[in-house]
């Protein structure tokens, strides 16, 4: 348990909020809106958060757990945040330096694979294939994270 608490302790409250918004920025990048989410997309996002909670990496799990613990409040707060997706994901990327290279890569993989790809596939054909638009949006978001994570092939 101490390892998980140690992850959060590395960040200020403002930095932690930025990390909590990471899944929201990835979701927004795929669905193309910052607020007033389509309820079907939002339900998929919630399922992807649940799946992400089992991802490897203590930081990712702790961030996702904290998001799920106050999802409604964070959703409202995210809707009022003025940062763009690009600025937000860039800030997430910069903050991950504090977590170490391995933990940072696991966090980025969680954002891209569990959240981004999860939402994109659910929105696509048969709930399994990403549309070309969603795949392009996801690729751009992954680049904003300076991610070394590769998108899974359809």
Placement of each model-derived feature along the sequence:
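Small-residue-enriched hydrophobic alpha-helices in membranes
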Residues: 1-154
């Amino acid at each position: 348990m101490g390892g998980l608490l140690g992850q959060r302790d590395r960040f200020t409250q403002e930095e932690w909020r930025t990390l909590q918004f990471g899944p929201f920025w990835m979701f927004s990048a795929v669905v193309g809106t910052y607020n007033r989410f389509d309820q079907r997309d939002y339900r998929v996002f919630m399922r992807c958060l649940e799946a992400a909670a089992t991802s490897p990496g203590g930081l990712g799990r702790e961030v996702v757990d904290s998001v799920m613990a106050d999802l409604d409040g964070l959703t409202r707060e995210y809707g009022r945040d003025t940062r763009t997706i690009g600025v937000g994901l860039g800030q997430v990327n910069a903050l991950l330096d504090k977590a170490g290279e391995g933990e940072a890569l696991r966090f980025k993989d969680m954002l891209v694979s569990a959240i981004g790809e999860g939402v994109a596939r659910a929105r696509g054909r048969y709930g399994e294939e990403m549309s070309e638009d969603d795949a392009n949006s996801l690729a751009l978001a992954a680049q904003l994270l300076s991610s070394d994570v590769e998108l899974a092939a359809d």
